[in-house]
Design a protein with these regions (language model features):
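Short beta-strand segments
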Residues: 167, 403-405, 559
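Active-site diphosphate/adenylate-binding microenvironment
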Residues: 7-11, 15-19, 33-38, 362-444
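Generic enzyme active-site microenvironment
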Residues: 310, 403, 456-457
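A short, charged, Gly/Pro-tolerant segment at domain boundaries
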Residues: 165-174, 357-366, 563-566, 574-575
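Conserved short loop/turn motifs at secondary-structure junctions
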Residues: 218-223, 377-378, 458-460
């Protein structure tokens, strides 16, 4: 049995698991493992962004694109505390990475050394991470590392993915023990649970009784890589498909059966189909408030009058918000395959049966298109939001990976963007973390070096993490940041106008008391960092500027001035209790 230092064991294990990157920042608490990483630098690359939260967002986005985990590394105290946001973001959206944090040495536990959390328990950092990771491990000796590493890797990627924390006292990196590398993990994607025969038969019976079915697909569909099967099922039966943001791309956004997102900022056809359906087959979504119009009957859904088949790999999500008529614990890909295979057992389940319903849905699609399309050609300055989305849809290639930060721009993309491929539209949906898109796009680029990676980010979100330009220049990452510059925290400013009669305070950026709107020159900022920078204030310049940025194959910021006073047309609702909710701007609720 070889004698190894703890840091060597961790580095060798990551190499064995074919982890290509470790994102993190040095500190006195992890310097002991850096030497071990030096020895494997040709197989495991350390990339140091300028903030730990950014490291986590990069790792999160890497997994969303490639469905293979990487690792992060942080030092004791503040460095590791900065991981809370990115772990919460990943956990909320079922994304996985190995979060290695460092802690004070075991010989100093409970003595209040530099950066120890000790008020309730010695070296208590694992309790900080507990709510934001799938599991936390705290091996305090080198001989505890093999088991902890294997369990951490398996826990992270099996079932519903999630980040896992490995919190290590920094003496363990340098101490030695007689240890073996743990065996390689073979669990990732190896076990896909399916439905039992009775559940498949019941799902068929519900389909046979339905006249107006819809599919509602979410991140569980993306994680199981079920796009091909879902598209086949939808096409075979002529069933329209509603998507959550993290399910977008599983069926092409421009497919005739794709209705888009649902909820307040969803598309009108999706809300109309959702609230009028007599059967909803839900594949890997949890019906959060934004995709259910805050659970108000008739705005997006009409449960329990509408029958519900709820399929999810995580039993905790079945019935969380709506009690299903049939709850199925299964991998989405396996379940849809089972359903397709069993369809011949029920001859009455056919596209002909649902054709009148589909014709009705197509009418809603035509109405919505007639309502929104004229604004996609509006040539105004500052640029109209629909024009920006439409231009990017036209000039960006089908294989683009789009990373979206939180902000009002995200609402516009939810409503109108048509993702052409799965795992290509990255959102912080569950936790809505500002900075995710700004930082995550670099992780996406590392996961898919041959594909264009573009982040659309707000001016507020970008100024939370402007240091990303340094990392992109250092590592020659040709990512493009499109800054949606409306001189405001636009999403919250819109709430003030919609719910508080426009009593604007604290939601826009002004220079002193002059009333002059203020932001830095983002393009000059980019150039100062060694990246390319452009400013777009005229609509006729946007398309060519984006195309040039992609052609240059260099880090680039495009500062786009967007009209802050044009708001997405709501087609559902969303409530901030106890404030009364608003009626849709387009369409009306329908209560079955």
């Amino acid at each position: 049995m070889p004698r190894m230092k703890g840091g060597e064991l961790i580095a060798q294990y990551l190499v064995q698991e074919k982890v290509p990157y470790i994102f993190g920042i040095c500190g006195h608490g992890n310097v002991g493992i850096l030497d071990a990483l030096y020895d494997v630098r040709d197989r495991l690359q350390l990339i140091s962004p300028r903030h730990e939260q950014c490291a986590g967002h990069m790792a999160d986005a890497y997994f969303r694109v490639k469905h293979q985990p990487v690792a992060t590394l942080t030092s004791t105290g503040p460095g590791s505390a900065n991981m809370v946001m990115s772990c919460a973001t990943a956990l909320s959206d079922s994304s996985a990475f190995l979060c290695i944090t460092s802690n004070v040495p075991t010989s100093q536990h409970n003595r209040a050394p530099f950066q120890e959390l000790y008020k309730h328990n010695q070296a208590d950092f694992a309790q900080v991470m507990r709510p934001v990771v799938k599991r936390a491990f705290q091996p305090s000796r080198v001989d505890m590392l093999p088991l902890a590493l294997r369990q951490a890797m398996d826990t992270m990627v099996t079932g519903r993915p999630g980040p896992v924390n490995l919190d290590i006292p920094y003496n363990v990196y340098q101490e030695e023990a007689d240890v073996e590398l743990p065996p390689a993990s073979h669990l990732h994607r190896a076990h896909r649970p399916g439905a039992n025969e009775a559940d498949v038969a019941e799902a068929l019976a519900l389909l046979a009784a339905a006249r107006q079915p819809v599919l509602f697909i979410g991140h569980g569909a993306t994680l199981s890589e079920a796009g091909e099967e879902i598209t086949e099922l939808a096409e075979r039966l002529g069933i329209p498909v509603i998507t959550s943001p993290n399910g977008m791309g599983c069926i092409r956004g421009d497919h005739p059966l794709a209705l888009g997102f649902i909820g307040r900022n969803g598309a009108y056809p999706a809300n109309e189909a959702g609230r009028r359906a007599d059967l909803v087959i839900t594949l890997g979504t949890r019906f959060d408030d934004r995709s259910s119009s805050s659970w108000h009957d008739g705005y997006s859904w009409n449960f329990p009058k509408t029958r519900l088949v709820h399929v999810d790999i995580d039993p905790q999500e079945l019935g969380r918000n709506y009690a299903p008529d049939l709850g199925v614990i299964a991998d989405v890909k396996v379940f849809v395959r089972q359903l397709i295979k069993a369809l011949p057992q029920r001859a009455q389940i056919s596209a002909e049966r649902y054709a009148p319903w589909l014709e009705q849905v197509r009418g809603w699609q035509a109405q919505w298109e007639a309502f929104v399309r004229p604004h996609f050609g509006d040539s105004t300055s500052p640029l109209r939001p629909e024009f920006v989305v439409g231009t990017l849809q036209r000039v960006l290639p089908d294989d683009v990976i789009l990373a979206l930060d939180s902000g009002v721009h995200h609402n516009w993309f939810m409503q109108f963007w048509q993702s052409k491929r799965p795992q290509s539209m990255l959102n912080s949906w569950g936790y809505s973390s500002m900075g995710f898109g700004v930082c995550g796009v670099m992780g996406a680029q590392l996961a898919a070096p041959g594909r264009p990676c573009v982040a659309v980010v707000g001016d507020g979100g970008f100024t939370m993490a402007p240091y990303v330009l340094c990392t992109a220049v250092e590592h020659n990452l040709p990512v493009v940041w499109i800054v949606w510059n409306n001189f405001a925290w636009g999403a919250i400013r819109d709430l003030q106008y919609g719910l508080f009669d426009g009593r604007e305070i604290g939601t826009a950026f002004y220079k002193g008391q002059s009333g002059e709107r203020y932001n830095p020159d983002f393009a000059a900022w980019a150039r100062a960092c060694g990246a390319d920078g452009y400013t777009v204030t005229r609509p006729q310049d946007l398309g060519a500027t984006v195309q040039q940025a992609l052609k240059n194959q260099r880090p680039c910021v495009i500062d786009v001035h967007v009209d802050a006073d044009v708001r997405p047309p709501s087609t559902g609702t969303w409530q901030l209790p106890p404030i009364p909710y608003k009626e849709p701007a387009y369409g009306k609720p329908f209560k079955a």
